[in-house]
């Protein structure tokens, strides 16, 4: 797996722990990867969980995958955790962990990003995921 194979927007279609209603509660659930300078970064949101990813490509027993740590919001509380994913027959499959909380397998499919999304990293400490989304929607395009 290369960085290029991951770059882009992936729509979360299924999670082991949460149903489609929760996944798409605030925005359509997604995970997105991009290069910042020479580093693979990303972001995700499902339900009221939103996070920014610091990613690394790894290889174990001949299988390539991406792993990450994340920080962000879990409902209106600070959140953090880790996760991993691999490509499987055109899908992104993996597992997301919330530190000292739930973890869930997920599946995602590549899609075009719906509408404009401000991809600049910003602190949202003390702001709920829905408030953060409204704030991003009001940000003028860069």
Listing of model-derived features with the role each one plays in the protein:
Residues 4, 9, 20-61:
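N-terminal glycine/threonine-rich, aromatic-flanked beta-hairpin/loop signature
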Residues 140-142:
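Eukaryotic intrinsically disordered, low-complexity regulatory regions
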Residues 2-27, 96, 126-138:
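Tryptophan-anchored aromatic micro-motifs
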Residues 55-89:
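Mid-chain, well-packed structural core segment of small domains
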Residues 41-46, 66-74, 94-97:
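Short beta-strand segments that buttress and anchor functional surface loops
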Residues 20, 48-54, 73-79, 100-106:
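Short, surface-exposed beta-strand/loop "edge" segments at domain boundaries and coil↔beta transitions
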Residues 115-128:
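Extracytoplasmic/periplasmic copper-protein system
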Residues 77-116:
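Short, compact, well-ordered microdomains
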């Amino acid at each position: 797996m290369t960085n290029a194979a991951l770059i882009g927007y992936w729509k979360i279609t299924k999670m082991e722990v949460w149903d489609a209603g929760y996944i798409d509660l605030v925005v359509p659930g997604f995970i997105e990867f991009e290069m910042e300078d020479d580093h693979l970064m990303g972001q995700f949101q499902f339900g009221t969980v939103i996070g920014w990813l610091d990613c690394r490509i790894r290889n174990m027993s001949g299988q390539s995958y991406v792993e990450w740590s994340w920080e962000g919001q879990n409902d209106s509380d600070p959140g953090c955790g880790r996760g991993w994913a691999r490509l499987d027959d055109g899908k992104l499959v993996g597992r997301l962990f919330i530190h000292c909380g739930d973890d869930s397998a997920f599946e995602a499919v590549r899609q075009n990003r719906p509408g404009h999304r401000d991809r600049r990293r910003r602190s949202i400490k003390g702001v709920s995921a829905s408030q953060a989304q409204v704030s991003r929607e009001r940000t003028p395009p860069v």
